[in-house]
Amino acid sequence: MARVKRGVTTRARHKKVIKLAKGYRGRSKNCYRIALQRVEKALQYAYRDRRNRKRFFRSLWIMRINAAARQHGLLYSDFIHGLSLANITLNRKVLADMAVNNQDNFKQIVDITKEALTKSRVAQ
């Protein structure tokens, strides 16, 4: 049976890890064993934070919508409830963008939701 030399695959694997560790400080950028640990930890952080980013942005959108709705005399929960009553299906990302960049359009939506809320309260 022929002898298998694994220098090529080892070098390729090491190069891949060292390439991922580019920009790290100290021996973390050029010592394979240390770089491997740092890269594995970095990939764990990246995996975790891809999920955390979704939570963070949703909460940011909610804060922006809440602040803009309160400027027009409406609580966030009432505003969202009024949107569902008025059959407005804009998501929070779009609403937050409107609250920051298109305040006139956001004001019109707030007026529509206020109207829908008063109609539902009168009906009860």
Swiss-Prot record:
GO terms for cellular component: ribonucleoprotein complex; ribosome. Signal peptide: none annotated. It holds the Pfam family Ribosomal_L20. SUPFAM superfamilies: Ribosomal protein L20. GO terms for biological process: ribosomal large subunit assembly; translation. The keyword Ribonucleoprotein applies. Belongs to the bacterial ribosomal protein bL20 family. This is Large ribosomal subunit protein bL20. It comes from Ehrlichia canis (strain Jake). The lineage of its organism: Bacteria, Pseudomonadati, Pseudomonadota, Alphaproteobacteria, Rickettsiales.
